[in-house]
Amino acid sequence: MIKKNKEELNDMEYLVTQENGTEPPFQNEYWNHFEKGIYVDKLSGKPLFTSEDKFESNCGWPSFSKALNDDEIVELVDKSFGMIRTEVRSEKANSHLGHVFNDGPKEKGGLRYCINSAAIQFIPYDKLEELGYGDLIKHFKK
C-alpha cells in the first residue's frame, strides 16, 4: 500500500491536504491523465477513485463521476470565498481532497468530484496486485 507521513509532503501537498488549499488548474499532475488504474489518498493510501470514473471536465483538475467507496469520503459544507460548496475529505487521513459539484455527466449520475492532484497518488492497473490493491481489479472493464 502506498502512503506518506505528513512530514513527507511537499509544500503544495501540505497546502492542499492540511490547509484546505487548491493547486493551480491545468498545472497539476493528473488533470489530463487517463491511464488505467486507481487514485489513492496520498497520506493513508486508501483507494478513492478509479480511471473508469474519470472524465474530461475542462476545469483543470482531475474530475470523477463517483468515489470508489463512499465510506472513504467525507462531505462537508464549505462556505469559504463567499460560496456554498461541498468539500470532499478523505475519511481515514482527514485530508482535503477538493469539492463535489452537481454538474457532472448526467449519464454517470450527474456528479463531478473535482480533486486536487496534490492530494492523490495514481496506481497503474498493472501494479495493483503488486502494491496490495489486487482486490480492486474487479472494478475495471475487461
UniProtKB/Swiss-Prot annotation:
Keywords on record: Oxidoreductase
SUPFAM superfamilies from the UniProt entry: Mss4-like (SSF51316)
UniProt GO BP: protein repair; response to oxidative stress
GO molecular function: peptide-methionine (R)-S-oxide reductase activity
InterPro entries per UniProt: Met_Sox_Rdtase_MsrB, Met_Sox_Rdtase_MsrB_dom, Mss4-like_sf
Alphabetical list of Pfam families matching this protein: SelR
Keyword Ribonucleoprotein among UniProt keywords: no
Top-rank EC class of the record's enzyme: oxidoreductase
GO cellular component, as recorded: cytoplasm
The protein, known as: Peptide methionine sulfoxide reductase MsrB
Species of the source: Staphylococcus epidermidis (strain ATCC 35984 / DSM 28319 / BCRC 17069 / CCUG 31568 / BM 3577 / RP62A)
Lineage start: Bacteria, Bacillati, Bacillota, Bacilli, Bacillales
